[in-house]
Swiss-Prot record:
The lineage of its organism: Eukaryota, Fungi, Dikarya, Basidiomycota, Agaricomycotina. It comes from Laccaria bicolor (strain S238N-H82 / ATCC MYA-4686) (Bicoloured deceiver). Its cofactor is Co(2+); Zn(2+); Mn(2+); Fe(2+). Its EC number is 3.4.11.18. GO terms for molecular function: initiator methionyl aminopeptidase activity; metal ion binding; metalloaminopeptidase activity. A divalent metal cation 2 binds at residues 142, 211, 244, 339. This is Methionine aminopeptidase 2. It is found in: Cytoplasm. The keyword Cytoplasm applies. Substrate binds at residues 111, 219. Keywords: Aminopeptidase, Cytoplasm, Hydrolase, Metal-binding, Protease.
Length: 358
């Protein structure tokens, strides 16, 4: 892909907000909003997220055309990330890849990207989740889609896309997170998938969630589960959310499984003396290249780091870096994901990553 300096020809969907009986907000919520707005010019952050989202649309358009069975996971990841870096005009911590490209296959739903030496090849029968992040000045456009090359799992993809669209529709200023989750669950569970003569209900993955997004922090603290719950927390004006849903033909519950590839420096990392010189050196590199943005082992390789696993595991053990293992449902099941980033402006819900594709 060639570099592009004009990113703002599309700005996603805008939906006018209607205010419900939940429209009264507590003093503490108003105070938090005032504090957020005091620290940033909204119009500038809007332009940053829109630029990131436009790059996302262009990168994924290319990816959807070119990803094919027979490619390695490393080829796919490099193509997406190199395209992102070129289009967003990567500039240190000012703009670049928002997080490692997720390429989770089949029963694995999230947090897989290839490490160096991974020779996994995409197969025709695979269900591939493609989760791409782009950031401009720390504002992360987080959006994902699922690809399949056989019609067997089309209904699974349809269910998850519909559930994500439901989550977006139900979101807005003062919407309660538990109620959004209930609507997502209801939509998802209205679908079923037939595989080799056996009918499977589509289940929302109960221990995965959408999330708020803060500057340079992909998981901002608020979570939108995919099953109904009693969370009375409200969405607030000025917030960004990744509305994402995952559906499964399996148990509808994931566990950590497989080799870790995803990491991030913790926002609340303790100040602890590091006894390993290699850990101190690696932490300096992480701070310089990623800050609190998620990264993977391939990104450390690209930054010139080598023989770093002992140091990296030490940083994890000290609570300075968080590791994120792959998240998988039972073997033999299939999972799908769709996701968009939304921005809650005072009178408009802007689906910044919306495109012609999804």
């Amino acid at each position: 892909m060639s570099a592009c300096t004009s990113f703002l020809r599309v700005a996603g969907d805008k939906v006018n907000l209607s205010f419900s009986s939940n429209s009264w907000r507590t003093t503490s919520e108003e105070k938090r909003y005032d504090e957020r707005m005091a620290n940033e010019d909204p119009e500038k952050t809007y332009q940053s997220i829109r630029r990131a989202a436009e790059v996302h649309r262009q990168v994924r358009q290319h990816a959807r055309r070119h990803i094919r069975p027979g490619m390695t996971m490393t080829e796919i990841a490099n193509n997406i990330e190199d395209g992102t870096r070129a289009l967003v005009e990567e500039d240190g911590l000012l703009s670049g890849v928002g997080f490692p490209t997720g390429l989770s296959l089949n029963n694995c739903a999230a947090h897989y990207t290839p490490n160096a030496g991974d020779t996994t090849v995409l197969q025709k029968g695979d269900v591939l989740k493609v989760d791409i992040g782009v950031h401009v000045k720390g504002r992360i456009a987080d959006s994902a889609f699922t690809l399949t090359w056989e019609p067997t799992y089309n209904k699974l993809l349809e269910a998850v896309k519909a559930a994500t669209d439901t989550g977006i529709r139900e979101s807005g200023i003062d919407a309660r997170l538990g109620e959004i989750a209930g609507a997502i669950q209801e939509t998802m569970e209205s679908y079923e998938v037939e595989v080799n003569g056996t009918v499977y209900p589509v289940k929302p993955i109960e221990n995965l969630s959408g999330h708020s997004i803060n500057p340079y922090q992909i998981h901002g603290g608020k979570s939108i589960l995919l099953v109904k719950n009693d969370d009375q927390t409200k969405m607030e004006e000025g917030e960004y959310f990744a509305i994402e849903t995952f559906g499964s033909t399996g148990r509808g519950r994931i566990v950590e499984s497989g080799e870790v590839s995803h990491y991030a420096r913790r926002m609340d990392a303790p100040h602890v003396p590091l006894r390993l010189t290699s850990a101190k050196t690696l932490l300096k590199s992480i701070n310089k290249n990623f800050g609190t943005l998620p990264f993977c082992r391939r990104y450390l390789d690209r930054a010139g780091e080598s023989k770093y696993l002992l140091a990296l595991n030490h940083l994890v053990g000290q609570g300075i870096v968080q590791d994120y293992p792959p998240l998988c449902d039972q073997r033999g099941s299939m999972t799908a994901q769709f996701e968009h980033t939304i921005l809650l402006r005072p009178t408009v819900k802007e689906v910044v990553t919306r495109g012609d594709d999804y």
